[in-house]
């Protein structure tokens, strides 16, 4: 065991360099990173994708393979990780540090139930000193039924601690039987089973809706307060950082650009990159106005580097920035450090005066997006899309006898929805995961058929995609949440975009001309036409998906979580592209999202969904400024404030009821802080409150 430096913290990373060997040369994923985390401290690690955040975290716990640490040191609770034996590393991972991964499937084994996996982690922690490697890998680790029962009870207690409701009913569930939020909590329970001194959480909230995110952050905050667990939180969501972190480390291209207390970073960022990141956030821009962007992209981590890696994207860069040695300056008074050769970086600046710029005015001349208050574009009063009494139910019968006897269970995915989308507007559909948003979108696109009710596009009733003619099919474009999974990896960008054109009889020369036009519209170069999906960044792949969706000039485009997994800088570009396309082509958007800050910026109207029903529908400014339904209010209160000293996101307690067995009366009553006896007795009607329609007994004008 290597002695810890006298001034070290619980975690001390000094001048870390991690590289990957490839056939095209070494990839410099991490270049000279230094990070510390004190006992009981919560530190945020932020930056765009490709900045080296996850590789840094994996290097800390010795999971950097196939990469290698070529320089620097990592001290974790007195152990030099870079010099540790396999046994020492196992002890560290089982006792001192644990990791929560962005994708819980990296932690959860699909063939074992949740309780057994948590119990096994508890057992491994209890027997660290006596276990050999073979014993450590032995499954199952329990020698008797009584021992298994003991650890099972402890697993149930741990599940309750991370916020899994009714853990006794879920301890025997398999990962595929849990929602995304519950799987993430199960992964956290496994990580906390060893009672670690340091918890590394890698993008734990990226795919979660706002209320589940608030609940997860509250559990982390509570663990930190009650057990003194230090946390290294990796995220690209600066709202999450403002909510929970004591300090922030800003990374770019494998290097640390700036460090400091969270309040100072948010109020007075010093590095041009930090300022630009903050400027790209919708919360920092007037509703409906054009979002600033950061020109360019994170450089490829190959080849030799000179000067500041951010210089090619920085409008303040000098020749010294591009070619010289960049100093890291301590700001003093515990205000952190900044690595920048530009002298003004050492001076105090407001967070809104950085280097992010407009990415150019839209071709149509419009400088706004969505419904800027008091100045949005005129919208047609006649609806382009109508859903009248639409429901979608799924039979959960186990066999033909249940169907014959009518004793099968029914899942109510969408329940009696009335909704209109006017031509040229953006209607945002929001709500927690599992509320029926994507099913409603599938009913509009024809991927699903309503059990009852009617879907009309431009006044014409439409059925499934198989029943629609070519013209009706072309009326609706779709951008899926995961664009990579919707694109054939064997097709070039040109062929992927041209596929719907080919299906509609376009010849090759006409297709090629149209693809070039579409690439230009979504901001991609001609050279991207010959690229494959795996050769593109996340933002570029999403642009390809958008180009494909509008290839046949649809009147309405369904956007299912189009920017949820993107960094702030890439997200702002995509939102500007969508605004430009809408202005140029008079597109109508159904925008599905769990990111309410994005919805507030882009939407003309908002529809709030819960357990298959619409709780509230109204103009975006009215819904966000003065929510009518208690559920809408709860969603908005769950958004963490980006302003230092602002309120933290308030979690909505309790689990959503099952759509197989929804509660009688109002479906939200068991989680509603304002519920009255009549809420349990009768289902409320949809009522009009000025421009807003809401489904609630207790709301008054």
Identify what each model region corresponds to.
Residues 1-267, 344-625, 637, 671, ...:
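ABC transporter nucleotide-binding domains
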Residues 7, 23, 262-384, 397, ...:
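Charged, flexible cofactor/metal-binding loops and thiol motifs
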């Amino acid at each position: 065991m290597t002695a810890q430096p006298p001034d070290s913290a619980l975690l001390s990373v000094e001048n870390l360099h991690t590289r990957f060997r490839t056939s095209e040369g070494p990839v410099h994923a991490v270049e000279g990173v230094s990070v510390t985390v004190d006992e009981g401290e919560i530190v945020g690690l932020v930056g765009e994708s490709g900045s080296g955040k996850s590789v840094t975290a994996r290097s800390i716990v010795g999971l950097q393979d196939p990469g290698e640490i070529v320089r620097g040191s990592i001290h974790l609770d007195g152990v030099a990780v870079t010099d540790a034996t396999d046994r020492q590393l196992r002890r560290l991972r089982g006792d001192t540090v644990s990791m929560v991964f962005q994708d819980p499937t990296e932690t959860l084994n699909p063939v074992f139930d949740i309780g057994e996996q948590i119990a096994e982690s508890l057992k491994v922690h209890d027997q660290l000193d006596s276990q050999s490697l073979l014993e450590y890998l032995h499954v199952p680790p329990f020698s008797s039924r009584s021992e298994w029962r003991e650890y099972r009870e402890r697993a149930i207690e741990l599940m309750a601690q991370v916020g899994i409701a009714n853990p006794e009913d879920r301890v025997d569930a398999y990962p595929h039987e849990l929602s995304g939020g519950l799987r993430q909590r199960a992964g956290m329970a496994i990580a906390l089973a060893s009672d670690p001194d340091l918890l590394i959480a890698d993008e734990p909230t990226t795919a979660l809706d706002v209320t589940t995110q608030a609940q997860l952050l509250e559990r982390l905050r509570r663990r930190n307060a009650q057990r003194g667990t230090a946390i290294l939180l990796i995220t690209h969501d600066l709202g999450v950082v403002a909510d929970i972190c004591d300090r922030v480390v800003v990374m770019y291209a494998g290097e640390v650009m700036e460090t400091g207390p969270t309040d100072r970073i948010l109020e007075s960022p010093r590095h041009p990159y930090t300022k630009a990141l903050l400027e790209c956030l919708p919360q920092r821009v007037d509703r409906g106005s054009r979002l600033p962007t950061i020109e360019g992209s994170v450089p490829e981590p190959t080849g030799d580097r000179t000067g500041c890696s951010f210089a090619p994207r920085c409008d303040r860069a000098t020749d010294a920035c591009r070619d010289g040695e960049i100093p890291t300056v301590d700001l003093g008074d515990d205000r952190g450090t900044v690595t920048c050769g530009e002298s003004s970086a050492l001076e105090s600046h407001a967070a809104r005066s950085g280097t992010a710029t407009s990415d150019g005015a839209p071709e149509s001349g419009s400088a706004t997006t969505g419904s800027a208050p008091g100045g949005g574009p005129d919208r047609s009063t006649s609806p382009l899309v109508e859903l009248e009494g639409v429901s979608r139910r799924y039979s959960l019968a186990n066999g033909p006898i249940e169907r014959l006897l009518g004793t099968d269970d029914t899942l109510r995915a969408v329940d009696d929805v009335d909704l209109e989308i006017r031509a040229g507007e953006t209607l945002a559909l929001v709500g927690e995961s599992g509320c029926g948003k994507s099913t409603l979108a599938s009913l509009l696109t024809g991927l699903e058929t309503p059990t009852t009710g009617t879907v009309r596009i431009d006044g014409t009733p439409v059925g499934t995609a198989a029943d629609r003619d070519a013209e009706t099919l072309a009326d609706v474009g779709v951008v899926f949440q995961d664009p990579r999974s919707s694109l054939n990896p064997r097709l070039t960008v040109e062929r992927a975009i041209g596929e719907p054109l080919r299906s509609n009889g376009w010849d090759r020369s006409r297709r090629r001309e149209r693809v070039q036009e579409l690439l230009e519209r979504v901001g991609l170069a001609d050279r991207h036409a010959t690229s494959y999906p795996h050769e593109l960044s996340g933002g570029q792949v999403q642009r390809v998906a958008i180009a494909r969706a509008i290839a046949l000039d649809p009147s309405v485009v369904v956007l299912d979580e189009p920017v949820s997994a993107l960094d702030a800088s890439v997200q702002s570009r995509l939102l500007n592209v969508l605004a430009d396309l809408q202005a140029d082509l008079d597109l109508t958007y159904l925008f599905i999202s769990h990111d309410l800050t994005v919805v507030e910026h882009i939407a003309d109207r908002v529809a709030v969904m819960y357990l298959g029903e619409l709780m509230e529908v109204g103009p975006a400014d009215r819904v966000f400024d003065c929510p009518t339904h208690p559920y809408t209010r709860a969603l908005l209160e769950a958004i963490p404030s980006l302003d230092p000293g602002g309120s933290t996101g308030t979690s909505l307690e309790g689990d959503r009821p099952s759509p197989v067995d929804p509660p009688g009366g109002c479906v939200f009553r068991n989680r509603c802080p304002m519920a009255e006896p009549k809420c349990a007795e009768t289902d409320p009607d949809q009522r009009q409150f000025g421009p807003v329609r809401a489904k609630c007994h207790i709301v008054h004008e």
